[in-house]
Amino acid sequence: MGEEESTRIREWWVPRRGPRTLRLLIGLSFYPYSLMNASYVLIGSLLAPSVHFYRMAGMAVVYLLAVGVSAHSLDAMAPNRPWGEFLTRGQLEALALASLVPALAVGLFYALAYAPLLIPVGIAELFFLLAYNLELFGGAFHSDLWFAASWGFLPVIAGFVVQTDAVSIPSLAGGAFGFFTAFVEISASRPYKALKRGGGDESQVASKLESVLKGIVLAVIATAAFLLSRALFG
């Protein structure tokens, strides 16, 4: 297997041209999926009866740091090294820690200042961040269902809780939206990843899976944008 096929550099959000290291860094950010994850936080906040926009923005930054940077850095240390060896294990650990510490600090501030219910949500998210990405407990939590729960359901709940310090029926319904859209994303992502790493760029299956992935990302971001525009402009 060639160097290109041994990493995820063939996947749809990674630039096809440019310096290889830059392309891998952009790939490591998983920026469409990181924005999708942050959009769940916005959706949760915008379901609240009254929206404090600075809390919503701060919680979105928490998830961009914790998931967009830290979780993906930990995942890159997997035995199969999905992004190759362009960063050492020590560099990935430093990147994960440097992003996780401020994320935890901001989250704890919001919990102590406004929403103590964020503490159990944050503990659950920290557990999944470590258990899923490092495949702890024999990989028991490295599954599509746990991914959907931690990556789709809980961010919506966190977004709502930071506004209200409560959980409601609408927030649970929003969480269900997060869960099922995240489940679709991860269910399409795994076979797509395998096809791309196997050099199946031109296969019809890979093309269809790519369309599903792009569609689900845009659908979640568009939902957040719709709710945000409604909150801002009525």
What residues fall within each predicted segment?
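Long, highly hydrophobic alpha-helical transmembrane signal-anchor segments
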Residues: R23-S50, L134-V167
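Multi-pass membrane catalytic core of lipid/isoprenoid biosynthesis enzymes
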Residues: R23-L28, P32-L42, R55-L65, A71-L118, ...
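C-terminal ends of transmembrane helices
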Residues: S70-E85, F127-F141, I186-A194
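Helix-coil boundary and interhelical linker segments in multi-pass alpha-helical membrane proteins
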Residues: S39-V61, A103-V121, P155-G174, F226-G234
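Intramembrane alpha-helical segments
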Residues: G90-Q163
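Short, Lys/Arg-rich, polar N-terminal cytosolic tail immediately upstream
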Residues: M1-I26
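C-terminal transmembrane helix-loop-helix hairpin of multi-pass membrane proteins
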Residues: F179-G234
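Alpha-helical transmembrane segments and their membrane-interface exit regions
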Residues: L64-A71, A124-L134, F153-P155, G175-I186
